Amino acid sequence: MKNLKKALFLAFLGAGLIAPVQAEEVHMIMCGGEIREADQAVISAFEAKHSGVTVNAEAVPWGTCQDKSMTLAAAGDPVGLAYMGSRTLKQLARSGLIVPVDISDEQQGMYQPGILNTVSDGGKTWGFPHAFSTKALFINCGLVEEAGMACVAPKTWTGMYNMAKAINDNTAAAGVGVAAKDFDNTMHQFLNYLYSNGGSVNNAETGEITFNSPETVETLEFYGKLAGVAQEGPMGYERGQLTQLYNDGQIGMYINGPWGAGQHNDNIAEIVVPIPAGPSGESGTLLITDSIAVFKGSANEDLAMELASMLSSGEAQYDLDMSWGLTPIMQYEKMMDDVYYTTDYWKVFVDPIGSGGPEPMFEDFKALQAGINSAIQGIILGEGSAADLVAEAAETLAEGL
């Protein structure tokens, strides 16, 4: 009998019916369509540390990556981890699709003010913060001067509008780039103005919707007014598409993040200034993060958690922030002497961190986007008064909280 078992074993082995030990794979989705060098360096180090483990890092464009990650998880075939907008975390957590993460007290103390609030819900942390941005206004001085004005920072919405109108009326360019496409960063553009006018979307502690306010009505009215001196067809543009218009000299100014300077043509003489203040507020900015979530029930959940932690740890995170041109997500000056964000240019993006407003955390984040974008498109199309459109949007937001 013993010899029979041995013979059968050898027969199966010879026929190739006994599978070799399978190499382990960690599947990762990276929103944005590319794997950046800083992240790839960490992935390579992770694979070198774990012999036989490979990371399937799949780069997926922003337009589809979040839905893909969520659909796979809901279907019972989750990826190990995904880099995605932190706005998705509340829905993923409450649906039981991701697991909470542990960030050491030491690392928590390194983050910029407000960062951990963007990844927390119900007393738990649901993602490792991995990208952070604040915003500022980029102005093409050549077009401003061609329009007969001095290229100095407008401090108020009135000053910004007057500058944009002068460019629009006296040059071949539109005065300002306005985003109104049904896209997440259209909502983000609007929130930069809202937070510069003393407005808010909701009370983060109580959940009360505060969007229906005089400050929001003023902001929506101003957004519609800007559309009158903006590029043709704002509803066809999201923020990323405005960069090309700016490079082509077709718009005089637009709001972008600190990576903007690296995307702009060298021959553009520009200034970068704080977002002008509205009549009811002070200059502000949206504080927005993307993060790495670890999905529940993947084949190698522990490995996915380790990789997520490595990608977002001190030196690795610094390399990403510096090379990508991101607002520093951590207070790196506590870790090292020579940091990249000490210039006057970076001051415009770093100084507002303490007073900026967060991207709201809604369980139905698509309702948040739909409600705000509907109001933006409505004011541009003349479908109602700002007050009515804001009230309608607030009702949509209440359903998504």
What are these regions (language model features)?
Residues A48, E145, G228, D351-L401:
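Conserved C-terminal helix/tail region of periplasmic/extracytoplasmic solute-binding proteins
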